[in-house]
Design a protein with these regions (language model features):
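C-terminal-biased regions
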Residues: 2-62, 82-176
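Amphipathic alpha-helical protein-protein interaction segments
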Residues: 54, 70-73
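Inward-facing hydrophobic residues that define packing positions of alpha-helical scaffold repeats
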Residues: 74, 80-81
């Protein structure tokens, strides 16, 4: 198969089954920047610097979410949901903390929230844009159906592979 043919295939068809089964839903955004090839496919779409940029980013990510649904790719849908959620939380962090720094450098001491910095309103609006799309993802019928099917397939896979964790060992993690 040529590189062009591979690039035109849906990601789910490029991913070995064992790799797909190694994906864990996890809480919130965990794992979003580590699971390839989805990270590389979605990261260029993820932006939140201004409200228009956030609106375009959220729309582009929603379009990918729906495309993954058509392809029957739950992992792609969930990774897209995580990027959308990350857009919401990062924009909110920049709304709450000028410059986006939440903790004092080198410590886990939380810095006070800033009240009136220049970008506060725009970052809050960007966060709301992503939140609306994130809620659509969570409530999406195809997402819910594919999530149940993926978790069941993963439970069976984990059982066959000797209980390598996740569903087979009783550590199912809810998606938020």
């Amino acid at each position: 198969m040529t590189e062009t043919e591979t690039a035109s295939q849906p990601l789910i068809q490029q991913l070995p089954h064992a790799t797909r089964m190694s994906y864990r839903i996890r809480r919130g955004e965990q794992g979003v920047l580590t699971f390839e090839p989805y990270k590389s496919a979605l990261l260029p779409l993820w932006r939140f610097r201004t409200l228009p940029i956030a609106q375009k980013s959220a729309a582009d990510l929603w379009q990918k979410f729906e495309a993954y649904d058509v392809e029957g790719d739950f992992v792609g849908m969930d990774m897209t949901r995580k990027f959308i959620q990350m857009g919401m939380t990062r924009a909110k962090r920049y709304a709450n903390h000028a410059g986006g720094r939440k903790y004092r450098k080198g410590t886990r001491e939380e810095l006070p929230k800033s009240e009136g910095h220049v970008d506060k309103g725009e970052k809050e609006a960007a966060s709301r844009v992503f939140r609306e799309v994130w809620l659509r993802c969570r409530e999406h019928e195809g997402y819910q159906r594919r999530k149940r099917a993926f978790l069941e397939e993963q439970r069976v896979w984990d059982g066959l592979e000797g209980g390598k964790g996740g569903a087979a060992s009783g550590r199912l993690l809810r998606s938020t």
